[in-house]
Structures are given as C-alpha cells and as structure tokens.
Regions:
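Pyridoxal 5′-phosphate
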Residues: 1-368
C-alpha cells in the first residue's frame, strides 16, 4: 500500500506495514469498539501471551524474558531509569547513540549523580579492534553499565556488540543494547549478543503497526530492575510482565503484531538480510566513484545492511535532501550529527532497483 506519488527511502524511521497487518489492525479496532472494555480486556488482551511466545521465537529467547511495549525508547528508558545506580557510578555510551537515550542518561546524571563517560566514534569503520577499544579504553573499576547501539541510526554502522559485551562482562559491567534498527533487519538472535538488556521498535524492520516495541531482559536481571510504570506489587519481583503496566493501551495495534511476524517468517530472515544489503550496495556502488561524493557507510555485510549515508563535498545534507524531493519526489532524511554529515538512504524489501536508479540519477544531477 506504499504511496505511488513518491519514492520512500526513509524506511529507517518507520516502515510501512504489509496490507495483512493493516487489515488485522483495522479489524481489531472495529472489534474493540463494539464494546471496548469487554473486547479489549477480556478478549484481545488474552492474545498477549501467545504474542509473547511468537516474539520470543523471533528473538531466540524465553517468553519469560520478553515484554511488549510501544517502542525502543520506552524499552531502553525502562532499563536506564530502572537500574539501581548510585552517585559516582559510571556509564559508558557513545555520542553517536540515539538522542532519546543520550537525554535519558543526562537526566540520570543530573538527578542521581551518576557519571557519564562519552566516546566519539570515527565512522564508518571496518576495524573491529578500533571499535571495541573505544569502549574498553574508558572502562574503570567504577563502570557499572555500557550502552551499545547495535546499528547506528545515523549511518547504518553495525557495531561488534558481542566483542564489547564480552569485555564488559569480564569486568562485571552490565550491557544494554539499543536494537531499534537491528531486530528483524538481519540474522541474529538476542542471546548471541551476550547482552543483559535489549530493546527494539517493531514498526521498523518487523513491519508491525506504528507504536509497537519489545524489551528483552535476561531472566536473572528482571528482579534487579524497577519498572518505569509502577505496579501494585513488589517492583523488584521476578516477572517480566511488571514492565507492561501501561494502563489503557491500543490492544488492536498490539494484536496485529502477530501478522507482522507471519510476514517476516514468510520472507525468511536470511533472504531478507541479503535483499536489504543488496539494495544498499546497489545504489552505493553506482555513486561511490562520482567526484565529490563521500560514502559514510561500509559496503561490507559485516558492518552494514540496509541503511546507507551519502554526503557531497561542499554541500549541506539538507540541500541534497531537498533537491531529491523537489526534483525526484524521493523522501530521505538529512543527517548532521557529531561527525556524521550526509543524507540517510534506507530502502526496504519492496524497494525496486528502478527506484534506486532514480536516486542515482538524482545524486548525479545534484553533483553537477
């Protein structure tokens, strides 16, 4: 059901849901409104446990480690504000992390006196030792937590999460992973990352309805985290469901996630990953040798998948972004964040090579 009037190359923000997902959401919405309090809580809410099992299957973990929420920011802030940190405890994070997470840590720093240790990554990078070293070099005996973004949203850089996590755990440091852009994007299971906490938005690469997310908490860690929304029971109880006390929520959206999982499994994660990487490299290979063009994303599958970023010397990102939309009706997003300057291009499985040929034509015309 994608728009025929423009070429959407900003799927990294929110991906369109397949028609089957949209139809399920509308059907559940109509159903809810027949008698809201009855159908929402007594009928639709009964589908949460089967949904939890289905999400756990995609994640490769126990259903008792999966909480269903609204987006990755909510999931990550549940952990950031729920961790029992005290004044002087150190947290390591990157300036390339997502702004909501940076702001959350700054708020804890202001309110609770924790100490933030910020690293600044030079990207793109295919040097695993360099990337791991940037984190490890700032670990101290006071470091309690390291926050790692699996895929940097600004340019699509994949970080070696497991290597960093291994080094952190050797030192007794807990590991939080921002998986907003990695979950259902390429082939991995959450336990493979050796992290303690992981959160993702399902409306990105799982193609679920807008406003759906998942939070993973390693089983033995659940009892150590306070929920973001209070419960009427012990907040440190050993039950993942304590993180779902959101009050009235859109059950019709939540239950349509199942159709997104079916669509995802129909494609298959291996085939999906190959398709997404192919599309990214298709356009990047065609523009990389144009004078003045700078690629801000690796072409190697270990370090990038669907998300790419391109800059043009002497031009601001918003100039290229505006040019592409005004002249070619291509929707992208201009990025100027720390040392990443360019336009983010994010195709999806439905994107055609003809769409990307138009993009290449537009970049060539802009450079002239």
């Amino acid at each position: 059901t994608v728009s025929p009037s423009l070429i959407n190359l900003n799927n990294g923000g929110v991906s369109p849901a397949p028609k089957t997902v949209q139809e399920a959401m509308k059907r559940y919405f109509d159903y809810s409104n027949e008698a809201p309090s009855y159908y929402m809580w007594r009928i639709l809410d009964q589908g949460r446990e089967p949904l939890r099992k289905n999400l756990a299957n995609v994640a490769g973990c126990s259903p008792e480690e999966i909480a269903i929420n609204r987006n990755s920011s909510e999931g990550l802030e549940t952990i950031i504000f729920g961790l029992q940190l005290k004044a002087g405890d150190e947290v390591v994070a990157s300036l390339q992390d997502y702004p909501n997470m940076i702001n959350a840590y700054k708020q804890r720093e202001m309110r609770d006196g924790i100490k933030m240790k910020w690293i600044n990554l030079e990207l793109p990078s295919e040097d695993e030792d360099y990337l791991v070293r940037q984190y490890v070099n700032v670990f101290t005996t006071k470091t309690k937590v390291v926050h790692i973004t699996h895929i940097i949203n600004w340019n699509g850089q994949i970080l070696p999460v497991k290597k960093i996590a291994n080094e952190a755990h050797k030192r007794g440091i807990e590991v939080i992973v921002d998986g907003a852009h990695s979950f259902a994007h390429f082939d991995f299971k959450i336990p493979d990352l050796d992290c303690d906490y992981f959160a993702a938005s399902l409306h990105k690469w799982l193609y679920a309805p807008i406003g759906t997310g998942v939070l993973y908490v390693k089983k033995e860690k659940i009892k150590t985290i306070y929920p973001l929304f209070a419960t009427n029971e012990n907040p440190l109880k050993d039950d993942i469901r304590k993180f779902e006390n959101l009050g009235t929520r859109p059950f019709f959206i939540e239950q349509a996630i199942t159709k997104a999982i079916e669509f995802h499994e129909m494609i298959g994660i291996e085939r999906k990953e190959k398709r997404l990487h192919y599309l990214k490299n298709y356009w990047m290979e065609k523009v990389k040798d144009i004078p003045g063009v700078k690629l801000n994303t690796s072409l190697h599958p270990k370090w990038g998948c669907a998300i790419g970023n391109v800059g043009v010397e002497g031009k601001k990102p918003n100039e290229l972004d505006s040019f592409l939309f005004t002249n070619y009706k291509i929707h992208t997003v201009a990025i100027t964040w720390e040392n990443i300057v360019g336009v983010r291009i994010t195709p999806n499985v439905y994107t055609t090579t003809k769409n990307l040929d138009v993009l290449v034509e537009g970049i060539k015309a802009f450079v002239k």
